[in-house]
Amino acid sequence: WIMGHMVNAIYQIDEFVDLGANSIEVDVSFDDNAKPEYTYHGIPCDCRRWCTKWEYFNDFLKALRKATTPGDSKYHEKLVLVVFDLKTNSLYNYQAYDAGKKLAENLLQHYWNNGNNGGRAYIVLSIPNLAHYQLITGFKETLKNKGHPELMDKVGHDFSGNDNIDQVEKAYKKAGVTGHVWQSDGITNCIASFIRGLDRAKKAVKNRDSSNGYINKVYYWTVDKYATTREALDIGVDGIMTNYPDVIANVLNESAYKEKFRLATYDDNPWEAFKN
């Protein structure tokens, strides 16, 4: 999965997919009442990027639905996965359940079209704080209460805080999550990747490949350089988040990688660990 980073303006959906992304990451900011408000990152953000592009969240969802609904004039067949980077650090821990509830209501209405031929992309809810695990509970229970528990088949999870992998597993146990887990690892592109290294990403890959691990997929962020892309592919990640999808696409076409990797399509299950 080539994951376009910080796609917060509607026009950027086309831009990133045209550059080679089959997945996008969208920042979601919340108001004081835990309601998703804007697709907005804010300052600071990655180097060589504008941090302040934004849309109203529900407007973005409607555009995203069009981009992922077969037959629509704005449809992109290859856009199959959307990561919502949920900026919940502005919220108190007790608001996490409410944030999940309101997020589910917004997605149900504006993205899934109340279960009637809505957008088809798989969705990953990425939470920065392990203490906010109840967001998952609120999201899941709301879909169930609204009569659409089946939509959870399209939803996966990520804790993005680079916490110890054992601690992440405990948070999932508290939330009752037993699958559909993506594990992110990484650092802003402003800091050279060799300073952080790939040790934690390697641990995540090892967990994914073990018989009793909780992780289904591993992605690494934010990768803009050819050398770092190769390093991430060499340890066996499933996804790379990038500001330059064309860089990742070019590396995937190199002889060392094109036999081993290919771009994921809608038919590839994002909740299943890939077995060679």
Swiss-Prot record:
GO BP, sorted A to Z: killing of cells of another organism; lipid catabolic process
SUPFAM superfamilies, A to Z: PLC-like phosphodiesterases (SSF51695)
Cystine pairs: 45-51, 47-190
Keyword Protein biosynthesis: no
Tagged with keyword Endoplasmic reticulum: no
Catalytic reaction equation(s): an N-(acyl)-sphingosylphosphocholine = an N-(acyl)-sphingosyl-1,3-cyclic phosphate + choline; an N-(acyl)-sphingosylphosphoethanolamine = an N-(acyl)-sphingosyl-1,3-cyclic phosphate + ethanolamine; a 1-acyl-sn-glycero-3-phosphocholine = a 1-acyl-sn-glycero-2,3-cyclic phosphate + choline; a 1-acyl-sn-glycero-3-phosphoethanolamine = a 1-acyl-sn-glycero-2,3-cyclic phosphate + ethanolamine
Keywords: Cytolysis, Dermonecrotic toxin, Disulfide bond, Glycoprotein, Hemolysis, Lipid degradation, Lipid metabolism, Lyase, Magnesium, Metal-binding, Secreted, Toxin
EC primary class: lyase
Pfam annotation, one family: GDPD_2
Tissue spec: Expressed by the venom gland.
Protein localization: Secreted
Cofactor: how bound: Binds 1 Mg(2+) ion per subunit.
Residues that bind Mg(2+): 25, 27, 85
Names of required cofactors: Mg(2+)
Name the record gives this protein: Dermonecrotic toxin LarSicTox-alphaIB2c
UniProt source species: Loxosceles arizonica (Arizona brown spider)
